Curated annotation (Swiss-Prot):
PANTHER family: METHIONYL-TRNA FORMYLTRANSFERASE, METHIONYL-TRNA FORMYLTRANSFERASE, MITOCHONDRIAL. It comes from Sulfurimonas denitrificans (strain ATCC 33889 / DSM 1251). (6S)-5,6,7,8-tetrahydrofolate binds at residues 108-111. This is Methionyl-tRNA formyltransferase. Its EC number is 2.1.2.9. Signal peptide: none annotated. NCBIfam families: fmt. SUPFAM superfamilies: FMT C-terminal domain-like, Formyltransferase. Gene3D superfamilies: 3.40.50.12230. The gene is fmt. The keyword Phosphoprotein does not apply. Attaches a formyl group to the free amino group of methionyl-tRNA(fMet). The formyl group appears to play a dual role in the initiator identity of N-formylmethionyl-tRNA by promoting its recognition by IF2 and preventing the misappropriation of this tRNA by the elongation apparatus.
């Protein structure tokens, strides 16, 4: 079967490579986002999916707007059986949706967490399970009919990188399953009354206050490595653990100093802070930081 693949980040790149190494599947073209400047030096960097396509010698297109007439004409001129979409970053116009069945791999149990940050939302909400949904795309955002859902459990202390890696493997296998057994699956309409939406993560989302220890820890799980979590002062909490969930404390008060960490109170619960990073400085142990600031038990970390 012939496939047009549309995807951009690592998640998409892994799925693309799985397709390229599967018998009876031919990826005839990749559509991905344009190269973007990255880092302080603004080095023009290709998306992860493009690197895979270059490795395997696949035709690559990087339109700024998939909706442009020229791009739509180009896509619809390519003979294919399916279009597979994974974290592409653009909405597919109706003309392309009609060209071939468009199958999207979304990293949540739809209709929960439609949108740009489903993995982070899973961790922010402390969910104990998540999954990948294969769906037939329509003109809405993650609103298409569901073909199959593969669920996995989420560990209580699992970080975003680990969950991302596991969901990527699930999505890769699910893609092959759905393509090879497409006619066996009956599309199921999503229940919009159960839907929730999630936006793109910004740097500002990483700001925390010592209100709820569980919420802080979940933000840490979701936002490591980026954007990280930090106090209003700019002090970054680089490595933390949830110490306990229920105690009531003064916000930010140092409750205990241990041999490798400090225990910081929240209005509800407390966290163990192992390393910190002040603005414009390197990461350091929490002990080194409080010693430098001459902070002790009952003082406030801020």
């Amino acid at each position: 079967m012939k496939i047009i693949f549309m995807g951009t980040p690592d998640y998409a790149a892994h799925i693309l490579e799985k397709l390229l190494n599967t018998k009876n599947i031919e990826v005839v073209a990749l559509y991905t986002q344009p190269d973007k400047p990255v880092g302080r030096k603004k080095i023009l960097t290709p998306p992860a999916a493009k690197n895979i396509a270059l490795k395997y010698g696949i035709a690559i297109s990087q339109p700024s707007r998939l909706r442009d007439k020229e791009t739509v004409a180009e896509v619809t001129s390519i003979e294919c059986d399916y279009i597979v979409v994974a974290a592409y970053g653009q909405i597919l116009p109706l003309e392309i949706l009609k060209h071939a069945p468009c199958i999207n791999l979304h990293a949540s149990i739809l209709p929960h967490y439609r949108g740009a940050s489903p993995i982070q939302q899973t961790l922010l909400h402390g969910d104990v399970k998540t999954g990948v949904t294969a769906m037939l795309m329509n003109e809405g955002l993650d609103t298409g009919d569901i073909l199959k859902i593969k669920e996995i459990e989420v560990d209580a202390d699992e970080m975003s990188e680990s969950l991302f890696s596991r969901l990527t493997e699930v999505a890769s296998d699910l893609t092959i399953d759905v393509l090879e057994n497409f006619v066996q699956y009956t599309p199921k309409i999503q229940d919009d009354s159960l839907s929730s939406h999630c936006k793109k993560i910004t740097k500002q989302d990483g700001e925390v206050e010592f209100d709820n220890a569980t919420a802080i820890f979940n933000k840490y799980r979701a936002f490591t490595p980026w954007p990280g979590i930090y106090l209003t002062s700019g002090l970054k909490l680089k490595k933390i653990e949830l110490f306990e969930k229920e105690s009531q404390n003064e916000s930010g008060r140092i409750l205990d100093i241990q041999k490798d960490s400090i225990i910081v109170g929240c209005k509800k619960g407390s966290i163990k802070v192992i390393t910190l990073q002040p603005e414009s400085k390197n990461e350091m142990s929490a002990l080194s930081y409080i010693n430098g600031k001459r902070l002790n038990i009952a003082d406030t970390l801020s």
